[in-house]
Amino acid sequence: MSRKKTIKDYENLAATRNHEVISVSNKETPSQGDITLLCKTCNKEFTTTTISYQNARKTGCPHCKATSASLYWTGRARTKTPEQAKKNAEIKEHINKTRKEKGKAFANIKNKEDLKEKLTNDLYLPNGEKNAYNDFILKRLNDPVTGKMMEKHHIIPLHAGGPDEKWNLISLTPEDHIEAHNLRYLVYNETGDKNTIKFRNKTPNVTDQISKAKALGNETRRAQGTGIYEPGMSSKAGKIGGSVKSVEKDLKQSTKMTSGVYDALYNGSRWKHTKTNTEIVIPPNTIVKMPQLVEKLIEALPPCEEKTRLAGAKLTTATSALARVIKGKNEGGRSSYFGWSICKE
């Protein structure tokens, strides 16, 4: 059991931060109260909880923190760099293109009656269960609910390729709007619906529903030949996984990479293993994430101790270490990791 902290402990901590303790609200148990201090750096008083002050990453003075932030941004641009702006534009373009492709499935729907027919035809799932979302929407279309506060809901969501047309809209109460996305998430297991529910701050207990949601979504994808059942998908490590890249996610990750790591992944690189004299060339645009590089380096090695150790290393540790190898020892990185070094022409 750790020793109970006293006022003296907080006075000593304050002294190291150039602060002076003025008062403590809970003298019996200081760690459970508030503390008021004088910052001798900015000559201002501030009050915070003792726990917050104790765990502060720097001095804990909000005035000094605000001043430091202001000085940091003085003369600095807060806008995106041209590279980041370009990548964000690529992400947006890809999302719009994906939605347009998905929207082709609904090109034959021209009005509300066509939509009702579509919902009715898809009223039952491949496993024989009723499509709870379609059933809910059909009931609201046939027997509209009125109220003072109504919200517009896209019956076929925009994220699923639905158009922003009058025939694709329905007026729902706020409660029904949340329920609609909840039911659709249960049936189709799409992230867009889940995020909408979270945004409304009324997230259902997904933990209790996840098994049913996955089962229903799995049946739907199996019948439609999409997702993990799309031709060209592969199985690995006992789990069904997709070979189709999440382009949006990859592009977002690339904006956070250092220029060296970005070049090594997207523009290609050559690696050499010292002990086994193994070399591997990573062609441009074949891998886009550091975990993929780790996998390539493991596969390239013949059976040896370092291959076993690399395969058993924690993935975050391996990716971080290889990023430092790419950076180079002269730049504050490292020269190699488990024998692998990058060949810089």
Curated annotation (Swiss-Prot):
Keyword Chloroplast: yes
Superkingdom field: Eukaryota
InterPro entries the UniProt entry points to: HNH, HNH_nuc
GO molecular function terms listed in the Swiss-Prot or TrEMBL record: endonuclease activity; nucleic acid binding; zinc ion binding
Subcellular location: Plastid, Chloroplast
Chief place of localization: plastid
One GO location term (cellular component): chloroplast
Keyword Plastid: yes
Pfam families in alphabetical order: HNH
Keywords: Chloroplast, Plastid
Disulphide bridges, residue numbers: none
Name of the featured protein: Uncharacterized 38.5 kDa protein in psbA intron 1
